[in-house]
From Swiss-Prot:
Keywords recorded for this protein, A-Z: Electron transport, Membrane, Mitochondrion, NAD, Respiratory chain, Translocase, Transmembrane, Transmembrane helix, Transport, Ubiquinone
Domain of life (superkingdom): Eukaryota
PANTHER family named in the record: NADH-UBIQUINONE OXIDOREDUCTASE CHAIN 3 (PTHR11058:SF9)
InterPro entries registered for this protein in UniProt: NADH_UbQ/plastoQ_OxRdtase_su3, NDAH_ubi_oxred_su3_sf
GO MF annotation, one: NADH dehydrogenase (ubiquinone) activity
Name of the protein in question: NADH-ubiquinone oxidoreductase chain 3
Bilayer-crossing regions: 1-21, 58-78, 86-106
Function (record text): Core subunit of the mitochondrial membrane respiratory chain NADH dehydrogenase (Complex I) that is believed to belong to the minimal assembly required for catalysis. Complex I functions in the transfer of electrons from NADH to the respiratory chain. The immediate electron acceptor for the enzyme is believed to be ubiquinone.
Gene: mt:ND3
N-terminal signal peptide: none
Catalytic activity: a ubiquinone + NADH + 5 H(+)(in) = a ubiquinol + NAD(+) + 4 H(+)(out)
Lineage, uppermost ranks: Eukaryota, Metazoa, Ecdysozoa, Arthropoda, Hexapoda
CC terms in the record's Gene Ontology section: mitochondrial membrane; respiratory chain complex I
């Protein structure tokens, strides 16, 4: 176990040293106005090249990702119903679903699921 810990520490230190050397030896580029601005036929751009996104779009995407992970956590619970104690499985499943419903209620109550705004 000591050898595994020592090797892990050595590999971690070597990785950090290599990354620091790569950062120090890499070619530094100076950013000026031409490099930071989008190219538009050699002329200055007429308007901003970035379109504004609604923060609500990102919030809905994060909520979808969280609920997707929750579904992925619920699926194995169905598989282990045959091998586990039914009472323990029921209590664990109901507790987990209760926590998910509390989260859904909180998001609904905060208005995070409303598209009309």
């Amino acid at each position: 176990m000591l050898m595994l810990s020592t090797m892990t520490l050595i590999i971690f230190i070597i990785t950090i040293v290599v990354m620091m050397l790569a950062t120090l030896l890499s070619k530094k580029t100076l950013l000026d106005r031409e490099k930071c601005s989008p190219f538009e036929c050699g002329f200055d751009p007429m308007n901003s090249s970035r379109l504004p996104f609604s923060l609500r779009f990102f919030l809905i995407a994060i909520i979808f990702l969280i609920f997707d992970v929750e579904i992925a956590l619920l699926l194995p619970m169905i598989m282990i119903i045959k091998t586990s104690n039914l009472m323990n499985w029921t209590i664990t499943s109901l507790f987990f679903i209760f926590i998910l419903l509390i989260g859904l209620y909180h998001e609904w109550n905060q208005g995070a699921l409303e598209w009309n705004e």
